[in-house]
Amino acid sequence: MLSAADFDPKPRRASVAVDVGGVIVGGGAPVVVQSMTNTDTADIDSTVAQVAALHRAGSELVRITVDRDESAAAVPKIRERLLRLGMDVPLIGDFHYIGHKLLADHPDCAEALAKYRINPGNVGFKDKKDKQFAEIIEMAIRYDKPVRIGVNWGSLDQDLLTALMDRNAEAGSPLSARQVTREAIVQSALLSAALAEEIGLPRNRIILSAKVSQVQDLIAVNSILAERSNHALHLGLTEAGMGTKGIVASSAAMGFVLQHGIGDTIRVSLTPEPNGDRTREVQVAQEILQVMGFRQFIPVVAACPGCGRTTSTVFQELAQNIQNDIRKNMPVWREKYPGVEALNVAVMGCIVNGPGESKHADIGISLPGTGETPAAPVFIDGRKALTLRGPNIAADFEALVVDYIEKRFGQRTAAE
């Protein structure tokens, strides 16, 4: 018979810890949130601004494209500018095709980066593949940098895939093409990792990723990787898409894998709207981890969805205002009020669930529904503290939330 305990998250898979510029990935450390810029890295001003925005939003690692000499030459300047802003955020260099040459020609870039990302599907072709892969690994050893061996099904090693397809065709019970492709993705990652270790890069300097664009494929390849190795794993659904579709797909895929104890760092690859905010991918990654109970980044604002009893929009506007204020203030509050991430706020729209939900929060309000008395009881630490009335209920409650934060978290120190 099943019990409630059967539905708890599986224990985290034991993986080898990797130090990425002071941020620990794997080894039981909290799952790390990372992101990627979409600026031209050679445009130093734009890249610094976007990295800074991503880091302020909560990205603990930021990946930048290093695709040509001008980009490689800009990397140490970007790093220096960020340090002057007080941002010691580890930068990951994303290399394709000519990474071996760029790292060799730009030693300052090789030193400034905290990690190198290698794609075994395009690091080199035919006879040059292993040689150019080895050159990047040797650079990582020389500069004591970790690498992510990132396999992507859109640029999968075609020689390996063809060999597996040919072997499968001769099998008595052949697998589907999709299943063979999954196996090729896994083998590409593991064979590349084995080669890197053979060259001399220790396992605690290697992170693996296997990126696909379909939810079921992400679940499959990462589950297989987790079973066959103890490398730290980077999760991400490549080409997840725009808006709701991208958020839902990433959440469904990574949520399942994380629930099974798999994954040491995540990136949500959302296609931004034209002129959209790149930090959205950071917020979604944080929310995936937070709603699943793995990490806490920001106070939770619980709000009811509304129904026929809540024809007023006051509770919706209040919930939105509080959520926006929290996000705006978190960079300061995180330093000023240690532990504020654990705060729970409830903004409810009527008497049915309002009082009960508000009692479960640290501070909550039950606004009057349609036809109810125009009064809003406020609950603090599980007890009714006061009742707000009049036209300024929303503003009064917002002030109470700030006052609660100052009193509860303001006396703490970061060491507590």
From Swiss-Prot:
**Pfam families per record:** GcpE
Q: What EC identifiers does the entry list?
A: 1.17.7.3
Which reactions are catalysed by this chain? (2E)-4-hydroxy-3-methylbut-2-enyl diphosphate + oxidized [flavodoxin] + H2O + 2 H(+) = 2-C-methyl-D-erythritol 2,4-cyclic diphosphate + reduced [flavodoxin]
- Record's InterPro entries? Dihydropteroate_synth-like_sf (IPR011005), IspG_bac (IPR016425), IspG_bac-typ (IPR004588), NO2/SO3_Rdtase_4Fe4S_sf (IPR045854)
Matching entries from Gene3D superfamilies are given as:
Dihydropteroate synthase-like, Sulfite Reductase Hemoprotein, domain 1
Question: Where, in this chain's numbering, is [4Fe-4S] cluster bound?
Answer: C304, C307, C350, E357
Give UniProt keywords alphabetically. 4Fe-4S, Iron, Iron-sulfur, Isoprene biosynthesis, Metal-binding, Oxidoreductase
Which parts of the chain span the membrane according to its record? none
Gene Ontology molecular function terms on file: 4 iron, 4 sulfur cluster binding; 4-hydroxy-3-methylbut-2-en-1-yl diphosphate synthase activity (ferredoxin); 4-hydroxy-3-methylbut-2-enyl-diphosphate synthase activity (flavodoxin); iron ion binding
Required co-factor? [4Fe-4S] cluster
Q: In which pathway does it act?
A: Isoprenoid biosynthesis; isopentenyl diphosphate biosynthesis via DXP pathway; isopentenyl diphosphate from 1-deoxy-D-xylulose 5-phosphate: step 5/6
The cofactor note from the UniProt entry for this protein is: Binds 1 [4Fe-4S] cluster.
Q: Name one GO biological process term.
A: terpenoid biosynthetic process
Q: Which family, according to UniProt?
A: Belongs to the IspG family.
NCBIfam families, per database record: ispG_gcpE (TIGR00612), PRK00366.1 (NF001540)
Q: What does this protein do?
A: Converts 2C-methyl-D-erythritol 2,4-cyclodiphosphate (ME-2,4cPP) into 1-hydroxy-2-methyl-2-(E)-butenyl 4-diphosphate.
Question: Any idea what this protein is called?
Answer: 4-hydroxy-3-methylbut-2-en-1-yl diphosphate synthase (flavodoxin)
Organism equals Rhizobium johnstonii (strain DSM 114642 / LMG 32736 / 3841) (Rhizobium leguminosarum bv. viciae)
